[in-house]
């Protein structure tokens, strides 16, 4: 059910350039993480409602089973069980999203739900993903940042289920990497992938790897018309 009182968020750009792009209000891509308790139905409804007022065009980014299940496998769940569990979780999000974006107040916005698998044959996406993988193999600083991001994702999952005991095997950290590699192209250049002029990827916290992607610390960089915004619900 849509909320009658307009939900309110603040959005803070990763850089001053991000803030300038956000102020244009052109396009927002809302990132949703399966298995993250932050993304309750109410929170997602509120964020979509707010974004649809703030930005002219809004789309949703949701992982597909193959990549998202990697996080569960890296958390110690059997591969078959992980895929089944991920399938159920993503179906739940898709049902909720289908309901929200089909309501009268949002239908005219033509909000799309984007999944990684939609881009399996997309040349631009595959090119960006290859650049990410090459940077991982060629740059020690980028490799370290990717591994740390993977570690933090697994740690968050284990903490959420009461299973974190202070150490995570490096092999498990590597298992979750494809999820990160699949997501980074949307951090780098959503305008190129979705055919919009400017775009802001919205999420509720900074990416640990983000600062380096914006300031030129790595072999790959964020495109000029791409921004990243940290949203906080008031």
From Swiss-Prot:
State one molecular function term (GO): aminoacyltransferase activity
Top-rank taxon of the source lineage equals Bacteria
Q: Where is this site: Could be involved in aa-tRNA binding?
A: 85, 95, 179
Look up the EC number in the record and give it: 2.3.2.22
Pfam families with a match to the protein in the record: CDPS (PF16715)
Record's keyword annotation contains Phosphoprotein: no
What does it catalyze?
Answer: 2 L-leucyl-tRNA(Leu) = cyclo(L-leucyl-L-leucyl) + 2 tRNA(Leu) + 2 H(+)
- The active site annotation covers 33
**Keyword terms:** Transferase
What is the recorded function of this protein according to its Swiss-Prot or TrEMBL entry?
Answer: It uses activated amino acids in the form of aminoacyl-tRNAs (aa-tRNAs) as substrates to catalyze the ATP-independent formation of cyclodipeptides which are intermediates in diketopiperazine (DKP) biosynthetic pathways. Catalyzes the formation of cyclo(L-Leu-L-Leu) (cLL) from L-leucyl-tRNA(Leu). Can incorporate various nonpolar residues, such as L-phenylalanine, L-leucine and L-methionine, into cyclodipeptides.
Return the NCBIfam families for the record.
tRNA_cyclodipep
Similarity section: Belongs to the CDPS family.
Indicate what this protein is called per its UniProt record: Cyclo(L-leucyl-L-leucyl) synthase
Q: Which organism is it from?
A: Photorhabdus laumondii subsp. laumondii (strain DSM 15139 / CIP 105565 / TT01) (Photorhabdus luminescens subsp. laumondii)
